[in-house]
Amino acid sequence: MDKKNINNVKLGKDVKIFDFVNLYGCTIGDNTKVGTFVEIQKNAFIGRNCKISSHSFICEGVHIEDNVFVGHNVTFINDRIPRATNEDGGMQDESDW
């Protein structure tokens, strides 16, 4: 049984990824550690020498610089990039709210 869900991810050298993660479409820099039960979404960027502690959620578009520690159960939210669409299929923006 595969305990990691990793799809379309750019991994640097010596990256350590623990079990029960969901990583897709993101970039993770050299010597970074990703703990258990972490989700990192598409277009997120994690720098070099970082530690992403367990149960953390890093949403689309988040950019984490080098040498950053993200503590246990940290959640980044994304209220700048809307996920809803208009009737024509285009993305909603501030004027739609």
Give the label of every model feature segment.
Residues M1-K10, D19-W97:
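Flexible, glycine/small-residue-enriched loop-and-beta-strand segment within the central core
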